[in-house]
Amino acid sequence: VEPNPAPRITIRYCTQCQWLLRSAWLAQELLQTFGPDLGEVALLPGTGGVFEIAYDGETIWERKADGGFPEAKVLKQRVRDRLDPERSLGHSDR
């Protein structure tokens, strides 16, 4: 049985809105928490107020639908629930 390939997380952000730093910070939070369990965290420049995070192509956060930007804790929980539902996130689970 082939192990599942490590997931790809994409963060599409609006360059006109200057959301690169926010995107990079969230990417760093995910990499710091999940490290080698993630295959890639990619930052994708966009326009038109876009801020969307996807896990292997499945949208897990969308700024307009979810009402703003995710807290790191909420984003980590959404990634964990797909990657390894049994994993404890320590203080991020409280």
What are these regions (language model features)?
Residues V1-R94:
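Domain-level signature for proteins that mediate thiol-based redox and metal-cofactor handling
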